């Protein structure tokens, strides 16, 4: 990797694996852009754009948003977001082999190929316990958990004091659909990046500080 303050990576893992906890750590450490497709989609939904309305309908049913929507949104970020000049942490993308191939092609054309794909690995049973208690501060995307990471004041954001919400797709049935979709569509991505030689796996059932240390170790940055 080019310098200690630069990174171009993909963060892979099922819903609730801790991507939302670790990505800000990576963003701060490497001064890179955290490109979270979930946050981008929720921003589009909040603005009521056509893309947002289409995405909300799919997400509320526990499905995954189409390749075309995702590819166009990511390409726009990589082209127009100044923070991407110091690198980027892609979170929630790519989810499929066609997306991974399109991403690789685009990044190679721009002379900024991926350096690492880190997979956060967790058992489904633990994910269910983690995710069904998750609370979100909509304006910032900060996440809490009723059991594992509660806010200082019940149902209030630590920073602003504003109300927290439980996401509408954070219920058991929708979660099972999301995990089934994740396993079916995303696990081939791991094989794809293993073949290209940039994959590394991290046990994400460990405490967050241990997971962070492991990530830095896999990146060769500890």
From Swiss-Prot:
Q: GO molecular function: any one?
A: ATP binding
Q: Where is this region: LID?
A: 133-170
> Does the record carry Lipid biosynthesis as a key word?
no
Q: Where is the region NMP?
A: 36-65
Cited InterPro entries: Adenyl_kin_sub (IPR006259), Adenylat/UMP-CMP_kin (IPR000850), Adenylat_kinase_CS (IPR033690), Adenylate_kinase_lid-dom (IPR007862), AK2 (IPR028587), P-loop_NTPase (IPR027417)
Gene Ontology biological process terms, A to Z = ADP biosynthetic process; AMP metabolic process; ATP metabolic process
Location relative to the cell: Cytoplasm, Cytosol; Mitochondrion intermembrane space
The catalytic activity, as recorded, is: AMP + ATP = 2 ADP
Keyword Iron-sulfur appears in the UniProt entry? no
Instruction: Give the EC number(s) listed in the UniProt record.
Output: 2.7.4.3
Q: Which residues bind AMP?
A: 37, 42, 63-65, 92-95, 99, 167, 178
Q: Which UniProt keywords apply?
A: Acetylation, ATP-binding, Cytoplasm, Kinase, Mitochondrion, Nucleotide-binding, Transferase
Relay the domain remarks: Consists of three domains, a large central CORE domain and two small peripheral domains, NMPbind and LID, which undergo movements during catalysis. The LID domain closes over the site of phosphoryl transfer upon ATP binding. Assembling and dissambling the active center during each catalytic cycle provides an effective means to prevent ATP hydrolysis.
Q: How does this polypeptide assemble, per the annotation?
A: Monomer.
Can you tell me which family this protein belongs to? Belongs to the adenylate kinase family. AK2 subfamily.
Known function: Catalyzes the reversible transfer of the terminal phosphate group between ATP and AMP. Plays an important role in cellular energy homeostasis and in adenine nucleotide metabolism. Adenylate kinase activity is critical for regulation of the phosphate utilization and the AMP de novo biosynthesis pathways.
Protein name per the record:
Adenylate kinase
Query: What is the organism field in this record?
Result: Saccharomyces cerevisiae (strain YJM789)
Designated gene of the protein: ADK1
């Amino acid at each position: 990797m080019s310098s200690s303050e630069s990174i171009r990576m993909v963060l892979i893992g099922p819903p609730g694996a801790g991507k939302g906890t670790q990505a800000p750590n990576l963003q701060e450490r490497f001064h890179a852009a955290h490109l979270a497709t979930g946050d981008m989609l929720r921003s589009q939904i909040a603005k009521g754009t056509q893309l947002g309305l289409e995405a909300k309908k799919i997400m509320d049913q526990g499905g995954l948003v189409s390749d075309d929507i995702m590819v166009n949104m990511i390409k726009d970020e990589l082209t127009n977001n100044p923070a991407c000049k110091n690198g980027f942490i892609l979170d929630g993308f790519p989810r499929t082999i066609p997306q991974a191939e399109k991403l690789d092609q685009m990044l190679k054309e721009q002379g900024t190929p991926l350096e690492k794909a880190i997979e956060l690995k967790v058992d489904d049973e633990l994910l269910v316990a983690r995710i069904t208690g998750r609370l979100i501060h909509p304006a910032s995307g900060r996440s809490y958990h009723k059991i594992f990471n509660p806010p200082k004041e019940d149902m209030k954001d630590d920073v602003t004091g504003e109300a927290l919400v439980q996401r509408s797709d954070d219920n058991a049935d929708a979660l099972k659909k999301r995990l089934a979709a994740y396993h079916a569509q995303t696990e081939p991505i791991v094989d794809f990046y293993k073949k290209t030689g940039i994959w590394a796996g991290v046990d994400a059932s460990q405490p967050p500080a241990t997971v962070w240390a492991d990530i830095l170790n896999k990146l060769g940055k500890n």
